[in-house]
């Protein structure tokens, strides 16, 4: 399970060091893909394969499904962390997420998200006040 908030730096070569506590879960390979709110999602390879299989079952006659599958496939990059736990984020991914040197990696239960630190702070300011209401609306009787 991926939990917590971490603040790694992006180096000049576009490399980001993954939090040490997640490296074992990601050692078999990982998939970096464009996600919502201009963040990046990092999935263990096996979890991403399951997600892609489910998504590919959508009817190809549906234009939204086709667009989603195209964006998912085109916006995904397979990575293997190096011996220091670093992954290289593509220029396209860095541009999409507006990543600067200061990044935030958050655990999102079954995957990680990578954010630009300022974008994450802005997101938090907007959404923190509505956290209680959102949990009631989105999660209903679960909590």
Curated annotation (Swiss-Prot):
Family affiliation: Belongs to the MraZ family.
Entry keyword annotation includes Protease: no
Locations listed in the record: Cytoplasm, Nucleoid
Protein name per its UniProtKB record: Transcriptional regulator MraZ
Note: Was identified as a high-confidence drug target.
Alphabetical list of PANTHER family matching this protein: TRANSCRIPTIONAL REGULATOR MRAZ
InterPro entries: MraZ, MraZ_C, MraZ_dom, MraZ_N, MraZ_sf, SpoVT-AbrB_dom, SpoVT-AbrB_sf
HAMAP family found in the cross-reference section: MraZ
Signal sequence range: none
Cellular component per GO, a single term: cytoplasm
Primary subcellular site in the record, as a coarse category: cytoplasm
Swiss-Prot/TrEMBL keywords: Cytoplasm, DNA-binding, Repeat, Transcription, Transcription regulation
Pfam families cross-referenced by the UniProt entry: MraZ
Domain (SpoVT-AbrB): residue spans on this chain: 5-47, 76-119
Subunit details: Forms oligomers.
GO biological-process terms attached to the record: negative regulation of DNA-templated transcription initiation
Gene Ontology molecular function terms on file: DNA-binding transcription factor activity; transcription cis-regulatory region binding
UniProt keyword annotation of Isomerase present: no
């Amino acid at each position: 399970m991926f939990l917590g908030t971490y603040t790694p730096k992006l180096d000049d070569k576009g490399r980001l060091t993954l939090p040490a506590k997640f490296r074992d879960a990601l050692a078999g390979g990982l998939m970096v893909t464009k996600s919502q709110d201009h963040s990046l999602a990092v999935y263990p390879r096996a979890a991403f394969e399951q997600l892609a299989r489910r998504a590919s079952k959508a009817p190809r006659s549906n234009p939204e499904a086709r667009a989603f599958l195209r964006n998912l496939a085109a916006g995904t990059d397979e990575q293997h962390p190096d011996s220091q736990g670093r992954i290289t984020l593509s220029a396209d991914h860095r541009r999409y997420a507006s990543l600067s040197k200061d990044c935030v990696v958050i655990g999102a239960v079954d995957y990680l998200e990578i954010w630009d630190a300022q974008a994450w702070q802005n997101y938090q300011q907007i959404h923190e006040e509505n956290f209680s209401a959102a949990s009631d609306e989105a999660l209903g009787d679960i909590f």
